Amino acid sequence: METTVKNSSSDGEWKVVLPSKGRQGRRRKPKPKGQAEEEEQPWKSDDLEIDPQRQARLKQKMEISLKKIESSSFYTAFLEQLKSPEVSNQIRLVLGSETQLQMVMYGIGSIESYESPRFQLSIAILMKREFDWVGDNIEVFDPVLSATESSYLESLGCSVLSVNEQARREALKPTLFFMPHCEANLYSNLLQANWRMDRLSKIALFGNSFQMYEEQVSFDAEVICATKRIIAAQRVTSEFAIETESDDYFAAFHDSSWHFFSSGIDSELPLFVSD
């Protein structure tokens, strides 16, 4: 019997999110994944007008989300995990001789339309306030962002990227990639762009559990292609799952983990024919 890799869905099922599936907070129409879609491209929002009234309403929504997250037991547990010896030691290894991680957020979704993206952005902002090792400038990209959303993000001190990197950024310096509930191919793109230990070791990744991808098997060719590098990376990955017991934050953060990469005596990265 065929089983599927699972992730976020309205009925609670966990399945791989492929580019044609979309996810909460995305307004683009489904389209097949082609060569051009996988390449880095200059980007401008389809919604070019900055609406002051919409921006004021968005600011109010974000203030509510920030306060709700900051006062929650979920956030308390989130901070405790980051400050634990196991995770903080991993962060120190990623930092190396540097003092800060550059934070890059891919696939945030529409913060104007949906609460889950606002919760995810709130966590990133609160991390920046809490930890000196989070860089001052948070870089953000999602092709669904409107001009109003981009303007608001910039008012928070974020930089909205003008190029769709397809998550193919090389980690030339210590980088925190903040990618909760992104499509599987974006994690694969990130890994492929950094498929050498001196690059992977500079990455802290917050996103879908790699272990979950490995545990759930599929015979679908597209799913196998999207997840093969994720599964191969497991041999050099230290994963720390976060707790999402509260229903309020389950949709935004369920099955999310911290991932760090380091090679051991008996582990090395496999070669892929496509590389």
From Swiss-Prot:
GO terms for biological process: circadian rhythm; red or far-red light signaling pathway; red, far-red light phototransduction; regulation of circadian rhythm. It is found in: Cytoplasm; Nucleus. Induction: By light. Not modulated by far-red light. One of its GO terms (cellular component) is cytoplasm. Disulfide bonds: none annotated. Keywords: Biological rhythms, Cytoplasm, Nucleus, Phytochrome signaling pathway. Residues 23-32 have a biased composition (Basic residues). It holds the Pfam family SRR1. Residues 1-49 are annotated as: Disordered. The keyword Cytoplasm applies. Residues 1-11 have a biased composition (Polar residues). A motif (Nuclear localization signal) lies at residues 26-29. Probable regulator involved in a circadian clock input pathway, which is required for normal oscillator function. Regulates the expression of clock-regulated genes such as CCA1 and TOC1. Involved in both the phytochrome B (PHYB) and PHYB-independent signaling pathways. Belongs to the SRR1 family. This is Protein SENSITIVITY TO RED LIGHT REDUCED 1. It comes from Arabidopsis thaliana. The gene is SRR1.
